[in-house]
């Protein structure tokens, strides 16, 4: 089973969208194996967005992601990365397909409600950055026996 990292950003948390997003994830069949509400500090934000250091939008990005709590999750399932990315929609909500999280709940690229790993390498890095191994659980969903 593939794992991926997904985070409801401060705008999503502040707008009360955690429950709606978790519901969509679970209805799609992905399993949440770790989750926590947390406040990201600057040090963690810089590690998370290290590939953007030096870019013109970096300080705004750090300021936004540290502006309020986030809900961090590890999801597990077949093709979890691609599935989560399809559910989220394109980074620019105006280009996202109808029915995706970003199309339904976001209006601006810089405030687009949700983040998700874009590759197995970034998923591994982000999971290790936000979760200790003992925070990631292994369990069987009741429905798994019926599938």
Swiss-Prot record:
It comes from the Bacteria. One of its GO terms (cellular component) is cytoplasm. It is an enzyme of class 2 (transferase). ATP binds at residues 9, 57, 85, 91, 102, 112. NCBIfam families: PRK00668.1 (NF001908). It comes from Listeria monocytogenes serotype 4b (strain F2365). This is Nucleoside diphosphate kinase. Keywords: ATP-binding, Cytoplasm, Kinase, Magnesium, Metal-binding, Nucleotide metabolism, Nucleotide-binding, Phosphoprotein, Transferase. Pfam families: NDK. The keyword Phosphoprotein applies.
């Amino acid at each position: 089973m593939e794992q991926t990292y997904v985070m409801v950003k401060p705008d999503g948390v502040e707008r009360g969208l955690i429950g709606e997003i978790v519901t969509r994830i679970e209805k799609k069949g992905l399993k949440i194996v770790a989750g926590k509400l947390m406040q990201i500090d600057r040090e963690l934000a810089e590690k998370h967005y290290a590939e953007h250091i030096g870019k013109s939008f970096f300080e705004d990005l750090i300021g936004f992601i540290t502006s309020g709590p986030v809900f961090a999750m590890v999801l597990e399932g077949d093709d979890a990365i691609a599935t989560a990315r399809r559910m989220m929609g394109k980074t620019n909500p105006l280009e996202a397909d109808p029915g995706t999280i970003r199309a339904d709940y976001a209006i601006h690229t810089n405030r687009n409600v949700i983040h998700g790993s874009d590759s197995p390498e970034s998923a591994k890095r982000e999971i290790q950055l936000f979760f200790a191994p003992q925070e990631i659980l292994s369990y069987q969903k009741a429905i798994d026996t019926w599938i």
